[in-house]
């Protein structure tokens, strides 16, 4: 499959990747292109910004969770029908598992998807030193796939001097610069960036940045780099085909189960591919709001509670007693439920909010959720069930990602959690 594409990566978080990605997506749209957007890694919030810009869902690609064949399949599935795909990297380009490996990094994903990379260099306070920075990234891995450089927070006058030096001394294509735009800035909170709906004048900021990029970036070079990306097969991997064509899947499709998925301001962190897989297996997905609805959808066969910011809405969630009671009763009667992160917090006995107030929750699982003083657990983990009956998966390990400022007085004992590549559990 021919799929023009580029990845925007950087030397570290906070280099301007997200804002430049959004501006680039909008600029491509203004040029008449139909771009597709992707995010490297498990981040939920950056794809929401992409979606606000292009008006279509952005997708996560994570080389820790999926092998190369599956990763390519998911990319091709969502890139089909688009003129160009823009992948946003994560953290520093080479930063991967445990902070000691490139596995799971943006570099790893670029290799899996054979994607040419534009390195975003935050050049604030630098001139010639930026070349040493770039040289290090080019030479650290022979197959770096870095095909071009964007200098962020650099003046036009300095760029005109530095770009020719970089191209001559390093043999790298300089595709433009981004001047410092104080009007374009994304705030953050404890789980990362604020939500797109919370950013004042987001569309105006993105439009301003897009207009600027059309003047400061060489789109002819960028599009040529994207067009030069290698073709991918995009075929469905055998592991996925076996699941979707299995007898169990046929039974699920025949049963047409209703899956109630919590979705509102408190529960807003979803992976598009997970929901699409459930739908392809025959599940009828019905969204509901634990904040504002009186009760879950009727005739529900199962619950899905994803993450979000329930701690910002703890009082409202607690006050909706009818909803809490209905959910608790259904779960106690044996209804299947999958709850992660904020969704699990909601099902606990009580939850502490950001101001230290404690509110009763659904009380379907033991434990009281409390706020910690700092980020307690962060990064990828591998979960191994203590018995083969756990989760009915035959005792196979499950991969996950955690980013927690909250903890519970009862974390359970059904699984053993371990950090990959590190002696921590």
Residue ranges, per PLM feature:
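ATP-dependent carboxylate-amine ligase catalytic core
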Residues: 2-19, 25-113, 121-148, 157-161
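Residues that mark the start of a beta-strand
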Residues: 5, 33-36, 256-258, 284, ...
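Beta-strand->loop->alpha-helix junctions that form or flank phosphate-binding loops
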Residues: 39, 174-182, 284-292
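C-terminal and late-domain segments of enzyme folds
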Residues: 110, 215-216, 252-255, 267-279, ...
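A short helix->loop->beta-strand "cap" motif at the edges of active sites that frequently abuts
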Residues: 115, 172, 332-336
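Internal gly/pro-rich beta-alpha loop/helix module
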Residues: 128-251
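Phosphate-binding active sites in nucleotide-utilizing proteins
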Residues: 247, 251, 255-321, 325-330
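Cysteine-nucleophile active-site neighborhood
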Residues: 310-389
């Amino acid at each position: 499959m021919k799929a023009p594409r580029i990845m925007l990566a950087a030397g570290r978080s906070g280099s301007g990747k997200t804002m430049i990605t959004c501006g680039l997506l909008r600029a491509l749209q203004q040029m008449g292109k139909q771009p597709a957007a992707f995010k490297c890694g498990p981040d939920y919030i950056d794809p929401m910004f992409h979606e606000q810009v292009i008006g279509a869902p952005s997708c996560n690609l994570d080389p820790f969770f999926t092998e190369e064949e599956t990763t390519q399949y998911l990319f091709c599935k969502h890139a089909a029908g688009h003129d160009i795909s823009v992948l946003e990297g994560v953290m520093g380009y080479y930063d991967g598992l445990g902070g000691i490996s490139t596995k799971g990094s943006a570099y790893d994903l670029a290799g899996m998807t054979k994607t040419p990379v534009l390195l975003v260099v935050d050049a604030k306070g630098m001139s010639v030193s930026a070349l040493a920075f770039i040289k290090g990234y080019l030479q650290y891995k022979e197959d770096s796939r870095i095909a071009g450089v964007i200098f962020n927070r650099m003046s036009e006058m300095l760029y005109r001097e530095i770009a020719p030096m970089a191209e001559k001394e390093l043999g790298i294509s300089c595709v433009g610069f981004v001047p410092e735009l104080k009007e374009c800035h994304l705030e953050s909170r404890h789980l990362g960036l604020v939500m797109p709906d919370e950013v004042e004048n987001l569309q105006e900021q993105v439009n301003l940045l897009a207009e600027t990029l059309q003047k400061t970036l060489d789109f002819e070079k960028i599009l040529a780099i994207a067009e030069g990306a290698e073709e991918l097969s995009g075929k469905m991997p055998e592991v996925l085909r076996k699941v979707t064509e299995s007898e169990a899947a046929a039974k699920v499709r025949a049963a047409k189960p209703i899956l109630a998925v919590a979705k509102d301001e408190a529960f807003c962190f979803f992976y598009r591919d997970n929901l699409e897989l459930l739908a392809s297996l025959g599940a009828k997905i019905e969204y509901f709001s634990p904040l504002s609805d009186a009760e879950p959808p009727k005739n529900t066969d199962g619950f899905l509670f994803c993450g979000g910011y329930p701690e910002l809405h703890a009082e409202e969630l607690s006050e909706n007693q009818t909803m809490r009671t209905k959910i608790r009763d259904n779960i106690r009667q044996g209804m299947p439920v999958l709850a992660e992160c904020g969704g699990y917090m909601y099902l606990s006995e009580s939850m502490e909010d950001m101001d230290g107030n404690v509110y009763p929750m659904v009380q379907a699982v033991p434990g009281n959720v409390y706020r910690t003083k700092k980020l307690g657990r962060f990064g990828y983990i591998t979960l191994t069930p203590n018995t083969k009956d756990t989760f009915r998966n035959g005792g196979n390990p499950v991969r996950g990602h955690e980013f927690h400022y909250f903890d519970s007085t009862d974390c359970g004992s059904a699984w053993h959690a371990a950090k990959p590549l590190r002696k921590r559990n």
